[in-house]
Regions:
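Membrane-water interface of transmembrane alpha-helices
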Residues: 87-98, 145-156, 209-216
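Structural signature of hydrophobic alpha-helical transmembrane segments
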Residues: 76-87, 137-150, 198-209, 258-268
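Aromatic-anchored, glycine/proline-accented short structural segments
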Residues: 203-263
């Protein structure tokens, strides 16, 4: 495989990819495992796929509740997202067990490390998807994901305060460990009826977003360009405003007010700026990194449904709901085409 393909699939600099014959696990495991010399076929970043599908399914569930979509469409999408999430969790357990050096490389890499946050985020979303069917297990998933995201934030975000971060690693992926995680936790707490905790998590996500935004945009403006094969991760820039607005709706009761309109307005601006960047992002064609757009697009759909439900800015509401849903479906079709061509998994 060429260096360009490796970069496209893993998001890592090819010079940072190593081959391991074997590794000895920590003494407390008292186990010696022979490692494959091949790359693990499922990159950590692929958790962004169920992340986007879960988020869209939950937006569609709200759309069904207000009579805009059939219930079966939302529940079918959520079931597909749950199945994909479960497969990826199993795959990552296998990676930890039998591809330990690659797992440790994920943990230590300044960029890939952030994708680990997608695991607790999708665990929370899986709990929300299952909540109408199995309340107790669903609550368990939500609490497990929330505890996991806080633990990882302590490791990842807290660890960066020692001055170990770099400018090149300051891309929108940095939002995941403290912004996306806390917004999703806020939504889940609100759904469970724990409103005070919802506001706590919303505050954690909101102020984390504000503290990171200027640094990330400054790096995108003045730093070296993001590598062409992984430019899709810049699409994560769409997420904070719309995901934060969704969390605010969950915590505040779902009504359109001035603060919600402020968030939607900023999200719309990010959408327009990212549209302008699409030709630059697509210089080397579509890659799975474009799933970085999916969380923001799915949340944009939900914001559109809220506008429609409240009969506010109806044209904008229908545009956000239609564009968000359609573009996530386009991502799904493009990904299925990669799979058909045998270009989805790392070889």
């Amino acid at each position: 495989m060429s260096q360009a393909n490796l970069t496209s699939l893993s998001g890592l600099n090819p010079s940072c990819i190593y081959r391991f014959e074997s590794a000895i696990l920590p003494p407390f495991l008292n186990t010696h495992i022979v490692m494959s010399t091949k790359k693990f076929p499922v990159p950590l970043s692929y958790f962004s796929m169920p992340l986007g599908l879960f988020a869209l399914g939950l937006s569609w569930r709200y759309g069904a509740r207000i009579g805009l979509l059939p219930t079966w469409a939302a529940e079918t999408l959520l079931a597909a997202a749950f199945a994909l999430w479960l497969l990826l969790v199993i795959a990552y357990i296998i990676k930890i067990r039998f591809f330990r050096p690659e797992f440790l490389q994920d943990l230590q890499d300044l960029v890939q490390c952030c994708f680990i946050s997608a695991i607790p985020i999708t665990t929370i979303l899986a709990g929300l998807a299952a909540l109408p069917y199995q309340t107790l297990p669903a609550k368990g998933l939500i609490l497990l994901g929330t505890a996991g995201q806080l633990a990882f934030a302590m490791y990842r975000a807290g660890g960066l305060w020692r001055g170990v971060h770099t400018l090149d690693a300051t891309t929108p992926i940095v939002y995941l460990p403290t912004v996306a995680t806390n917004f999703v936790s806020a939504t889940a707490m609100a759904v469970l009826g724990w409103s005070d905790y919802a506001w706590l998590f919303l505050g954690a996500g909101l102020f984390s977003w504000l503290s990171l935004e200027a640094a990330i945009l400054s790096r995108l403006r003045t730093g070296t360009p993001v590598n062409a094969p992984v430019r899709g991760i810049v699409g994560i820039q769409l997420a904070p405003a719309f995901v934060g607005c969704g969390a605010y709706f969950a915590a505040s009761g779902g009504h359109i007010d001035t603060f919600a309109l402020l968030l939607i307005g900023y999200g719309c601006l990010q959408f327009l700026l990212l549209l302008r960047l699409l030709p630059w992002m697509l210089e080397q064609g579509f890659s799975p990194s474009f799933w970085g757009f999916s969380f923001g697009l799915a949340a944009m759909t939900g914001c559109g449904f809220h506008l429609i439900a409240e009969q506010r800015l109806l044209f904008l509401g229908y545009f956000l709901a239609t564009a968000g849903s359609g573009l996530v479906m386009l991502l799904l079709l493009a990904t299925l085409n990669l799979a058909r061509q045998g270009r989805l998994l790392v070889k």
